[in-house]
Amino acid sequence: MSAPRPISRPRVRRLATILSLAVVLAASGVAPASTAAAVSGASVEAAILSLVNRDRAALGLRPLRRDTRLATLADRRAANLAASRTFSHAAAGGDVGAELDRVGVQWYVWGELLAFRSGGLTSKTAAAIYGAWRNSDPHWSKLMSRTFNYIGFGTAVRTSNPRVFAVAVLTESRDHTAPRAEMLTATRSGTTITFTWRGWDPALQSHWAGLRDFDVWYRVDKGAWRRIRDNTTATSLSLSSRTPGHLYELAVSARDRAGNIGKISAPLGIRVP
């Protein structure tokens, strides 16, 4: 397991609130859309995130991770803009920090970006909105920040005098991304079977916890799973003297240094003839 960077020291919440006020001052409009195929809001949001992380990678930065709670909040705030005749952070719903607290999102610093584009959601919407943010230094500095580690995008369409409104909500938060694990190989020598696996903790720009250990799960002939190793840092396991004529399976789950536990992997099995 490769060692992650040390977890950043949490910032004082009072300072974070002051910084947030500066973060949310930027907003932008976008040039009118040309004719293009209609798409879903979810596809536009995913495309913007892909563009953001492409440019972060080019600058040697780690990706921003999508947080579904931030995306839900961003969707709601975009809908507020679509329903309002005013384009502002206040019209989007006011204090983002208070909203984050209300839905239980832990944060040290938050930021919000707004954009609008004439017309409906099309295949050109993501590039147009991201292009506007990219060409605005205040917006660009937030998206390429070394502080923020989570993001959520939201979009909404005003049908009368059609416009698309886009919102990005960013936070610097503790690592709450579950680590991943997968089985790699299953081999046999006589009645001894050996399994290997790997795990990783998705990297964050800040507060990255890093992979800690695994739990190992075992079953025979599709029976009940039982955990046979807890908190092991091993990435292989040999089991000897297995009874012939049975199928033996292993699966693993990973844990990071922040205590986040990932899903149990797909199992891998081998039969002893």
Which residue stretches match the model-derived regions?
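Extracellular fibronectin type III
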Residues: R257-P273
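Solvent-exposed loop/turn segments flanking beta-strands in beta-repeat/beta-sandwich domains
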Residues: W200-V220
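A well-ordered secondary-structure block
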Residues: D95-E172
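Short beta-strand segments within Ig-like beta-sandwich modules, predominantly Fibronectin type-III
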Residues: R227-A234
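Secretory targeting and sorting signals
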Residues: A3-A38
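Short, well-ordered surface patches within globular domains
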Residues: V39-V103, R146-I151
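Surface-exposed, short loops/turns at beta-strand junctions within beta-sandwich domains
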Residues: S240-L247
